[in-house]
């Protein structure tokens, strides 16, 4: 009887731990959201909800690529620079060629090439991803300043602004594009061999290699995807700002990484789900939105974001220790 009771308790504990691991941060977001609805003036208004959706849409998109980088055990610190440079490149090419599609293609190509360089250096040359992407972050940001001559590049073709300001079924186009991105990357991670290979590499790269996983090719594709979604976010941002801004999104990479880790993506690699990314971004976005509505100074917001990042890293460390102990 005692053994049956113990077994049942073990199953119950295990089941709760697994449910918390899967949905815990979404529960935290739900509690936070309800608290903001009750205590923050105008938080629940439709205008603010739409603004919140727009504010986090770019973060969600970039975080999709970062999810794969972190799940494979790497980082991509160049995402913010790619956002800026892709926007500038798109603006310059549109103005020179008078072609929207050529401009968008140029911006996406910039992101893909940046990711290709990152992936090749990290996977083929075996250089640490932190150092590699720190270098490309500087290079790509410098290119953005060179291309734009250090100034905002106004876009002359007003048709381009439709991408950022169009409404589809009552919601801004960037929100729908972000939802599509989340669905695609969620399926890619959970339902494809490429996704399983990504998690296997993050769990144990050498074991994955011995098992026949094409580690080099997979890592290169991961960074190309990260570059592409960052470039897409930069193009949408340029459309909303009606110009390419070389100085935009500075420090944005840390926000995206902290959101991923806060949601449950492991810094050690091998663990990650699209729901973790959604939860992390929603929590960070809601906190920032609430602070703005409460007129909390931008300087204090830096402190809050830093505390959240530190808490996320400590929590990740605690989870890793708990799993090893189990």
Regions found by a protein language model. Give the residues of each.
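Transmembrane alpha-helical segments in multi-pass inner-membrane proteins
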Residues: 230, 240-306
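Cytosolic-side transmembrane-helix boundaries in multi-pass membrane proteins
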Residues: 1-34, 210-217, 291-326
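Inter-helical junctions in multi-pass inner-membrane proteins, predominant
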Residues: 39-51, 144-150, 189-195, 222-258, ...
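Hydrophobic core segments of alpha-helical transmembrane domains in multi-pass membrane transport
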Residues: 25-38, 66, 137, 141, ...
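Transmembrane helix-bundle core of multi-pass membrane transporters
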Residues: 125, 129-192, 218-221, 240-249, ...
């Amino acid at each position: 009887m005692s053994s049956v009771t113990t077994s049942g308790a073990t199953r119950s504990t295990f089941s709760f731990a697994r449910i918390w691991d899967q949905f815990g941060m979404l529960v935290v977001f739900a509690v936070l959201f309800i608290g903001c609805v009750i205590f923050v003036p105008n938080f629940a208004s439709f205008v603010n909800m739409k603004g919140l959706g727009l504010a986090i849409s770019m973060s969600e998109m970039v975080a999709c690529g970062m999810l794969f980088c972190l799940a494979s055990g790497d980082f991509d610190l160049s995402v913010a620079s790619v956002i800026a440079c892709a926007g500038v490149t798109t603006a310059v090419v549109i103005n020179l060629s008078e072609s929207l599609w050529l401009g968008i293609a140029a911006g996406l190509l910039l992101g893909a090439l940046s990711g290709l360089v990152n992936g090749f250096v990290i996977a083929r040359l075996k250089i640490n991803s932190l150092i590699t992407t720190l270098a490309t972050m500087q290079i790509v940001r410098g290119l953005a300043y060179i291309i734009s001559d250090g100034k905002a590049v106004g876009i002359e073709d007003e048709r381009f602004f439709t991408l950022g300001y169009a409404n589809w079924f009552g919601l801004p186009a960037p929100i729908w594009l972000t939802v599509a991105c989340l669905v695609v990357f969620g399926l890619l991670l959970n339902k494809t061999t490429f996704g399983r290979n990504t998690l296997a590499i993050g769990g144990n790269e050498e074991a994955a290699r011995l098992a026949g996983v094409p580690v080099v090719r997979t890592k290169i594709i991961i960074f190309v995807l990260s570059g592409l979604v960052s470039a897409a976010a930069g193009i949408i941002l340029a459309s909303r700002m009606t110009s390419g801004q070389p100085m935009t999104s500075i420090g944005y990479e840390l926000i995206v990484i902290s959101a991923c880790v806060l949601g449950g993506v492991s810094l050690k690699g091998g663990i990650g789900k699209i729901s973790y990314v959604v939860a992390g971004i929603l929590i960070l976005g809601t906190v920032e939105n609430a602070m703005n509505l409460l007129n909390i100074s931008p300087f204090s917001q830096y402190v809050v974001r830093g505390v959240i990042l530190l808490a996320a890293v400590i929590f990740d460390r605690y989870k890793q220790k708990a799993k090893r102990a189990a």
